């Protein structure tokens, strides 16, 4: 890292401890997106109510001890602990965090998780969603949530971003 700009203390507290705890994680995506943030207030895991949501079945943790802006690395340690060996953490009253062996994969899971949070919020507003069976959720997750599928699914979004911002990679 070069330069003399300010460091985002909260980002450092979370990401530095996550990477220390999980050497297999090369990238982590976290933001305060509207649907992830809204879903996080429910204090529960995403249900396997659709094919896309099955990607996160038994692959998410939840951090329930939100205490405001993360300023201490100790809280980053607790977030990493809540994530465990999973790919996604729901940070209650805060948002979502996804991980991966590459930026592409972490971002694809973030984008997909955001849409799945939106879908579950809509489904719950309409009634009582019906989850798929445990067996179906696992089979579907194994098919759609592997690194190759995630990487390939992200490429059209990456191409669109580069087309919209051609100097991005300069």
Place the predicted regions along the sequence by residue.
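Short HxH-centered metal-ligating active-site micro-motif
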Residues: 1-37, 73-85
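Low-complexity, flexible helical/coil segments
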Residues: 3-12, 28, 62-70, 124-135
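Electropositive phosphate-/nucleotide-binding environments in soluble metabolic enzymes
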Residues: 8, 12, 69, 73, ...
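Generic secondary-structure microfeatures
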Residues: 22, 33, 43, 66, ...
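Short coil/turn connectors at secondary-structure junctions
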Residues: 22-26, 51-52, 57-60, 84-87, ...
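Class I SAM-dependent methyltransferase SAM-binding "motif I" and its flanking Rossmann-like core
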Residues: 31-71, 75
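A contiguous binding-surface segment within folded domains or other stable secondary-structure elements
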Residues: 61-97
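A conserved C-terminal secondary-structure "cap"
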Residues: 85-170
């Amino acid at each position: 890292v070069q330069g003399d700009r300010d460091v985002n203390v909260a980002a450092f507290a979370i990401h530095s401890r996550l990477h220390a705890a999980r050497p297999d994680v090369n990238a982590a995506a976290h933001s305060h997106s509207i649907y992830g943030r809204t879903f996080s207030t429910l204090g529960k895991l995403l249900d396997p109510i659709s094919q896309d949501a099955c990607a996160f079945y038994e692959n998410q943790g939840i951090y329930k001890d939100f205490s405001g802006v993360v300023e201490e690395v100790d809280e980053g340690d607790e977030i990493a602990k809540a994530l465990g060996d999973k790919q996604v953490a729901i940070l209650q009253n805060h948002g979502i965090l996804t991980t991966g062996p590459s930026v592409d994969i972490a971002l694809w899971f973030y984008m997909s998780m955001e849409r799945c949070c939106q879908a579950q919020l809509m489904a719950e507003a309409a009634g009582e969603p019906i989850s798929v069976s445990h067996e179906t959720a696992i089979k579907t997750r194994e098919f759609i949530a592997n690194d190759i599928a995630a990487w390939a699914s992200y490429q059209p979004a990456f191409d669109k971003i580069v087309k919209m911002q051609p100097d991005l990679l300069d």
